[in-house]
């Protein structure tokens, strides 16, 4: 079962003012190597990502007050991970959250990264060590992401997560094998702005059973927060590299997330869910393109829709 880890962070978002989020849809070109997939064009990919970072740093227009930047799943070459963090830490404005997927690596490397950033990820190491101790899994591929938060003080905090629900034959990229299943994701409580959010790879919003769907755990955790503090989950950022449209049942269940079909869930009633996908040009060597990529979305509770009005002036 996935563990939700609460983390307090220092982000000075202005209370009552809207926040700016940039979803950077870029293509993923992947090829199979061993039991995993790697980027075909890591240098070209880095040039694309670097150009996005430079736009953010220049801060023209709305980008001068950018609060959240999202890049797709498996977007960043692992060889550029350090450089990515260096740019964010040195050149990004304070109060900025950057969420990006990283090229898959072996479990042992992922474990080493958790150790490297143990100040922010110490709570996640024990579960990974338990998996490693339980069998010969060090070579298992990990699809992972980073949530890099530059706090109001300028301090850079680095949080790492692995995809929590990659089952055999479930998804196009990983139909050949089982990936490592991530054991945690973070529930961020930003202060003093009182803004609560989650960031993860691919929301598992199919109710496989009561215990293994992360959507159920998110709802329960947010409800508990609401009942104890009267706060809820303000935003959920989901990075993807997924074909669209998805199965129609997904729409039914995401509606259930907002309490439209199921029991009332006040902890997520006001949640804004941002699905940041890759662009429409992804290519996977050996896989014929039969789906349409390039669709991101923002989902809110239906009660936020503006009602149709017939007035004299309109």
Enumerate the language-model features and the residues they cover:
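Active-site catalytic loop in hydrolytic enzyme cores
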Residues: 2-7, 114-230, 234
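Cys-nucleophile CN-hydrolase/nitrilase-fold catalytic domain and related Cys-dependent amidase chemistry
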Residues: 47-161, 242-244, 255-259, 263-267
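A general structural motif
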Residues: 16-18, 63-66, 95, 194, ...
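Active-site beta-loop-alpha junctions enriched in small/polar residues
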Residues: 103-107, 163-166, 202, 278-279
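CN hydrolase (nitrilase-like) catalytic-core segments centered on the catalytic cysteine
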Residues: 89, 93-100, 205-314
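N-terminal, active-site-proximal structural segment of metallo-dependent hydrolase catalytic domains
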Residues: 1-69, 73-78
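Active-site-proximal beta-strand elements of phosphoester/diester hydrolases
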Residues: 18-40, 158-163, 195-206, 237-239
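Eukaryotic short linear interaction motifs
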Residues: 29-32, 78-79, 106-108, 168, ...
């Amino acid at each position: 079962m996935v563990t939700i880890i609460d983390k307090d962070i220092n982000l000075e978002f202005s209370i009552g003012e809207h926040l700016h989020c940039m979803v950077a849809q870029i293509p993923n070109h992947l090829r199979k190597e061993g039991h995993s997939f790697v980027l075909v064009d890591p240098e070209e990919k880095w040039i694309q990502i670097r150009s996005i970072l430079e736009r953010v740093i220049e801060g023209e227009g709305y980008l001068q007050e950018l609060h959240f930047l999202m890049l797709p799943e498996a977007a960043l070459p692992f060889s550029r991970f350090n450089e990515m963090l260096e740019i964010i830490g040195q050149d990004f404005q304070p109060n900025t959250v950057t969420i990006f997927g990283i090229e898959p690596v072996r479990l042992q490397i992922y474990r080493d990264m958790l150790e490297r950033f143990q100040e922010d990820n110490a709570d996640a190491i024990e579960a990974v060590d338990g998996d490693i101790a339980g069998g010969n899994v060090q070579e298992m591929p990990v699809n992972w992401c980073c949530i890099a938060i530059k706090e109001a003080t300028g301090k850079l905090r680095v949080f790492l997560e692995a995809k929590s629900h990659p089952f055999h034959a479930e998804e196009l990229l990983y139909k050949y094998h089982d990936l490592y299943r991530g054991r945690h994701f973070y529930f961020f409580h930003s202060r003093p702005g009182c803004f609560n959010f989650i960031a993860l790879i691919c929301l598992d919003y199919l109710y496989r059973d009561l215990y293994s769907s992360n959507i159920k755990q998110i709802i329960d955790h947010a409800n508990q927060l609401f009942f104890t503090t009267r706060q809820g989950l303000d935003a959920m950022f989901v990075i993807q590299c997924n074909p669209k449209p998805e199965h129609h049942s997904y729409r039914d269940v995401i509606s259930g997330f907002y309490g439209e079909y199921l029991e009332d869930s006040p902890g997520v009633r006001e949640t804004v869910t941002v699905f940041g996908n890759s662009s429409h040009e992804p290519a996977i060597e050996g896989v014929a393109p039969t789906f349409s990529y390039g669709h991101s979305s923002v989902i809110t509770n239906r009660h936020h829709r503006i009602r149709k009005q017939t007035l004299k002036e309109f």
